[in-house]
Amino acid sequence: MDYKIIILAVVITIVLIVGTQVWKQSILKKLLKHMQQGDFNAYFKLLDSLPCKYFYPPFNREYMRLNGYIMKADKKKIEECFELILSMRMNKKQELDVVIKAFYYYLDEDSKKKCKTLLERMKKIADESITQECQVIYDILLEEKTSYIDDM
């Protein structure tokens, strides 16, 4: 009798683990399908659904939302997403990824002030080579400095 209970518990555990992974992958596939088809309403609705909130942490959902707004080219929502994500708790790898993504976005938008703020934040978390590269890009494109011509 004890073996039957143990076997049943093991089977139930395996089914739950496999089932949740399948469900999570199913949600991700639906998100990708909506994004590829340009169905942003369905994409954002699925991001806000209870299963998505259960399986994906807030940072991941907001990062996916940001990518949706970038594909949609909704500048106001992109800025709101960057503000929200940059204020969230995240590990250094996530923070560096978001800071660099925001830096290049605001570089395209010619926003000196925001790029400068992001460069300062980047200096606290990134390798010197990354910050130096971004500093050079900032100086050339936004400050219009020509002092790097000899180095190139």
Where are the model-predicted features located?
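Transmembrane-cytosolic junction motif
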Residues: 15-42
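Generic helix N-cap/helix-start motif at coil->alpha-helix transitions
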Residues: 19-29, 54-63, 91-100, 126-137
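Soluble C-terminal extramembrane regulatory/interaction domains of multi-pass membrane proteins
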Residues: 130-152
